[in-house]
């Protein structure tokens, strides 16, 4: 299976996403695989048997969101210089979303930009983080506030890597699949309601459909100037939750699941979404053991955290809210008291 992202503008940044077992990757320049110890221990041998390159280096970064920062980026860039990579060299991001974001950002700034390839190894990164060219690091003010749009040259999605994925991380990836269905495709949502993603064929279809939906949006709006903002459904709340908990309590997909439930509650209270549809979405998330509640200790403080998000512009909070399953609205007209009312409902879970 193959999905194509058409980004032919003044510079062709189009690329293919291959959703099949990796057969071979042939490269003609120095190449560095960037990974973490866990992925390397489980899958590096498998990947090395598929890659041909004149010079191949392995760079291992510490595992986890805590290390998605300037210090780790500097370490990675230093290793690229140590190995004498140049502007013709290629980086391979081999891991989950953190590795993909870090490697992509390093590729965007190393010698003013070099090519990179995404080989995502988690469900969440396969259906979301590896597609679309968003790269970056976190800082003390929030998530992904330092970064760049830098498209990969190709993405290889191989479900072989999911065989060793813990159940919790699998469920976190399902949250992003549900997100795509709720925002863009009612038929896909109904299909998800009826089918079990733990079955291999169902999982492959869900990955393909999610990637197709995201690819179509990225092709229309590469740099998030308009419709691509719809992909942030659930994320406005999720990023505050992650920031408040120091990125330790929830996986990203878990925070997004809670964020979707919060966004749905806001949509119900503003008359956009029916209570029945909100419950359908919540029930689907719970079927995969995803959290759907977060204890908001201080609604006013939570509200102020929205303004640290890069999606907030001119002191205005934009929300992506479903107005039906498969349809959405992007709005900046929600009043503070409406938001606070929703947050108060989450003071106790």
From Swiss-Prot:
The keyword Translocase does not apply. It is found in: Cytoplasm. Pathway: Metabolic intermediate biosynthesis; chorismate biosynthesis; chorismate from D-erythrose 4-phosphate and phosphoenolpyruvate: step 2/7. It holds the Pfam family DHQS_C. This is 3-dehydroquinate synthase. It comes from Nitratiruptor sp. (strain SB155-2). InterPro entries: Dehydroquinate_synthase, DHQ_synth_AroB, DHQ_synth_fam, DHQS/DOIS_N, DHQS_C. Its main location: cytoplasm. NAD(+) binds at residues 63-68, 97-101, 121-122, 134, 143, 161-164. It is an enzyme of class 4 (lyase).
């Amino acid at each position: 299976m193959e999905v194509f992202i058409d980004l032919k503008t003044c510079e062709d940044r189009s690329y293919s996403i291959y959703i099949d077992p990796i057969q071979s990757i042939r490269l003609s320049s120095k190449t560095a695989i960037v990974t973490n110890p866990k992925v390397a221990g489980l899958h590096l041998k498998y990947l090395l048997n598929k890659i041909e390159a004149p010079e191949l280096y392995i760079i291992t970064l510490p595992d986890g969101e805590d290390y998605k920062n300037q210090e780790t980026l500097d370490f990675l860039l230093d290793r690229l210089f140590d190995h004498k990579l140049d502007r013709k060299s290629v980086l391979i991001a081999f891991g989950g979303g953190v590795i993909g974001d870090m490697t992509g950002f390093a590729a965007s700034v190393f010698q003013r930009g070099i090519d990179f390839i995404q080989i995502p190894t988690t469900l969440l990164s396969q259906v979301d983080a590896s597609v679309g060219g968003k790269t970056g690091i976190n800082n003390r003010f929030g998530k992904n506030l330092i970064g760049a749009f830098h498209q990969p040259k190709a993405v290889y999605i191989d479900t072989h890597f999911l065989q060793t994925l813990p159940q919790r991380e699998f469920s976190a990836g399902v949250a992003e699949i549900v997100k795509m269905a709720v925002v863009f495709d009612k038929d896909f949502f109904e299909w998800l309601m009826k089918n079990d993603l733990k079955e291999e064929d169902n999982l492959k279809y869900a990955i393909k459909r999610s990637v197709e939906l995201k690819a179509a949006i990225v092709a229309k709006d590469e740099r998030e100037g308009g419709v691509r903002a719809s992909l942030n459904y659930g994320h406005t709340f999720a990023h505050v939750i992650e920031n408040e908990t120091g990125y330790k309590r929830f996986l990203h997909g878990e925070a997004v699941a809670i964020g979707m439930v919060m966004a749905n509650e806001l949509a119900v209270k503003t008359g956009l979404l029916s209570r029945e549809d909100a419950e359908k979405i919540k029930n689907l998330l719970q079927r995969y053991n995803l959290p759907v509640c977060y204890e908001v200790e201080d609604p006013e403080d939570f509200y102020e955290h929205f303004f640290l998000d890069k999606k907030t512009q001119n002191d205005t909070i934009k929300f992506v809210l479903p107005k039906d399953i498969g349809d959405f609205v992007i709005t900046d007209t929600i009043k503070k008291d409406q938001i606070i009312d929703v947050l108060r409902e989450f003071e106790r879970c």
